[in-house]
């Protein structure tokens, strides 16, 4: 055996022995003979005995619990990319975004220069009640300094059981000394429909961050409000939505389908086929709809988009989705740890499984697949999409493909016309984000008084921010390149302005600003305005990535690189 191969399989052998041994106990019969181990039963009994040998005879003391915890992820990683193990704390944290609430102080923060910076204070939350403000720096929590601490450890200091107290030491802009606020932790809502608004007098827009416990209820509230404002057509934005609860996606898409339409079905080796159909009670069955997707749209997002596409209920716009078509069932241990085991595949109404290809035990390659798409040009041209899967047909006979995500009806490539190496370096080093944060911090009160994204945008256009950024970049070892600065002016202004509006305003303000020149959103609105959201079977379907499709280009990939990561506590 090749030494490298042997080394690679050693952890797996330990993992198999540990995991199986935990489940089977010590059901074995053996004896020693001349240094050999003879085991009457084979397979699982053999590895169970191996565990016993390690525990009783290994040269050093072995912490069997640690061995189990380390081995769990390794053995599951050999099955498929989505079967996974979470320890007790990890299990709770992993579903926090999907719960309706958590217990904390009620702030969103980011880490800048090793300091906890409050981005926003949740209205009506514990922190707001005692006077914590956006822009505050949280320096201490009780007697613990938070300076230089990793974000996950900061969250553990700020979160806690409802009713418990934490004393915050805060440095406020314009003051020298720390100010102290004692916050009583409470229930903080987790919102997944984080923005909705009218783009014009007819077009509603809803942004869905994930599919959590309250997402369906939040969507109904958003739709009701938009309906009251005169909505006649709708854009649902699922870009970057990694999924969540399947039953929530089913409830949501049910609102748009006539009675008896197949939404999704699941099937596995030990899981009989189970179908989910629309009940005909949806209030928006005839509302024209366009769904925006991209490579970050996965799982429940693909169930939603697949049901709309296969039932020819609306138009899918954007780029090919992630391609997660496996169903995990959580199985909890007594200590609170959880195994999420893949037990079935899900299939869209046409019968396609959109799970992209993977090799067992090659999780890293699977995670790198999106980079491979980017490198082969798929983000820029629909011609680069590999349609090697089996062909399926929608309800009216349009051809769709399985085996690798959902290909949109209208492809919107990423735009690189204004891209330069100067902009790329500024974005990927975080300097755009840092500059926007510093500017926001210095001008927070003035910007907040403007109230709307439109007013903030008009104000920022007069501030000559491009020149200010170039000077800021020079102070941080980013060599000034005037020609590239001008070529990338549109990108710089878009993301500097966007970050500032995001820092000072709400998600709604931020998305309203971006939507005005976002090619995918513009294309979606054009489809709706022309009455083309309901697909029709064409005699000859236009090939994705055609010249017409390339007229609409998106910069969302670069946007994701420049927006600061925000944490909730």
Each language-model region and where it sits:
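Cleft-lining beta-strand/loop regions that shape enzyme active-site pockets
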Residues: 2, 20, 31-43, 47, ...
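Polar, glycine-rich mid-to-C-terminal structural blocks
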Residues: 300, 312, 323-386
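Hydrophobic membrane-insertion alpha-helices, especially the h-region
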Residues: 11-27
């Amino acid at each position: 055996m090749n030494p490298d191969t042997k080394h690679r399989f050693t952890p797996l052998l330990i993992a198999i022995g540990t995991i199986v041994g935990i489940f089977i106990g010590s059901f074995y019969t053996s004896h020693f003979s001349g240094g050999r181990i003879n085991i009457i039963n084979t397979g699982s009994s053999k590895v169970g005995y191996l565990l016993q040998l390690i525990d009783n005879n290994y040269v050093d003391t072995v912490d069997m619990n640690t061995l189990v915890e380390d081995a769990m992820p390794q053995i599951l990683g050999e099955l498929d990319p989505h079967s996974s193990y979470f320890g007790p704390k990890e299990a709770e944290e992993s579903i926090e975004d999907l719960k309706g609430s958590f217990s904390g102080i009620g702030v969103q923060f980011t880490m800048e220069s090793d300091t906890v910076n409050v981005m926003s204070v949740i209205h009506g939350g514990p922190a707001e009640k005692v006077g914590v403000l956006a822009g505050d720096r949280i320096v201490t929590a009780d007697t613990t300094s938070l300076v230089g601490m990793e974000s996950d450890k900061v969250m553990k200091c700020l979160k806690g059981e409802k009713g418990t107290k934490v004393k915050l030491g805060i440095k406020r802009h314009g003051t020298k000394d720390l100010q102290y606020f004692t916050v009583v932790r409470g229930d903080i809502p987790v919102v997944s429909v984080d923005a909705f608004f009218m783009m014009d007098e007819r077009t509603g827009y809803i942004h869905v961050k994930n599919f959590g416990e309250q997402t369906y209820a939040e969507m109904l509230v958003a739709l009701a409000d938009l309906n009251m404002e005169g909505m006649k057509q709708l854009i649902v934005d699922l870009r970057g939505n990694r999924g969540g609860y399947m039953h929530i996606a089913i409830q949501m898409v049910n609102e748009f389908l006539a009675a008896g339409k197949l939404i999704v079905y699941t099937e596995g080796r030990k899981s009989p086929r189970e179908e989910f159909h629309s009940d005909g009670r949806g209030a928006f069955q005839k509302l024209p709809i366009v769904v925006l997707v991209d490579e970050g749209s996965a799982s429940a997002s693909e169930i939603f988009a697949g049901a709309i596409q296969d039932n020819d209920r609306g138009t899918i716009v954007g780029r090919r989705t992630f391609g997660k078509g496996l169903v995990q069932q959580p199985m909890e241990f007594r200590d609170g740890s959880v195994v999420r085991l893949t037990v079935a595949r899900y299939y869209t109404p046409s019968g396609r499984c959109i799970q992209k290809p993977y090799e067992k035990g090659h999780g890293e390659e699977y995670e790198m697949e999106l980079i491979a798409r980017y490198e082969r040009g798929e983000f820029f041209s629909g011609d680069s999409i590999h349609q090697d899967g089996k062909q399926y047909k929608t309800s009216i006979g349009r051809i769709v493909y399985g085996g690798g995500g959902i290909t949109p009806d209208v492809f919107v490539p990423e735009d690189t016309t204004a891209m330069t190496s100067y902009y790329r370096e500024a974005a990927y080093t975080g300097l755009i984000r840092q500059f926007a944060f510093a500017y926001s911090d210095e001008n927070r009160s003035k910007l907040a008084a403007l109230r709307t994204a439109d007013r903030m945008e008009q104000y920022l256009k007069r501030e000559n921010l491009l020149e200010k950024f170039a000077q800021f970049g020079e102070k941080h070892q980013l060599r000034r390149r005037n020609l590239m600065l001008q070529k990338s002016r549109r990108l710089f202004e878009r993301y500097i302005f966007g970050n500032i509006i995001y820092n000072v305003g709400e998600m709604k303000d931020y998305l309203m600003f971006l939507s005005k020149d976002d090619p995918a959103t513009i294309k979606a609105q054009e489809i709706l305005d022309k009455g083309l959201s309901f697909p029709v079977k064409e005699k000859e379907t236009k090939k994705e990535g055609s010249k017409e499709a390339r007229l609409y280009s998106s910069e969302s990939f670069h946007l994701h690189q420049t927006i600061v990561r925000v944490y909730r506590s």
